Amino acid sequence: LRATSIGACFALSAFDTPARALLLSPILNMESLILTMMDRAGVTEELLREQGEIAASFGQVLSWKYLCWVREHPVRSWTCPIHILYGSGDQMTPCRTVEAYARKHGAKLTVMEGGEHWFHTPAQLAALREWEERST
């Protein structure tokens, strides 16, 4: 299985253990990410529950149903080899979250210094290709 960002989150929530997993910039704690966005938008859980959906000033729509779904579908524990590529400048998932996940699940974590959540520069794409070759 190869998944990126929120795709990794959904894969970890939905799929049984694959033979191997390559996760690029994975969202490993969607609830925490949503709560951070709510805090940034000044939205409480009570307000979100009452209104159902709230458009935040930074372009995201916060959804009570989605927050509840995330809480009801936590990330599963896989027992396969897991390889993670993470950029040190990732703004979506804190480094401590990725490191804790890697320790708990025995994942091989590779951190690209200066990498971002979205690997898109020539240097980032080269690091991505190299990581894929080493991990498969």
Predicted regions and their residues:
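Conserved alpha/beta-hydrolase "nucleophile elbow" surrounding the catalytic nucleophile
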Residues: 2-8, 87
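Short, catalytically relevant binding-site loops at active-site mouths
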Residues: 6-9, 28-30
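Short glycine-enriched nucleophile-adjacent loop
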Residues: 8-21
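The alpha/beta-hydrolase serine catalytic core
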Residues: 18-100, 104-111, 116-135
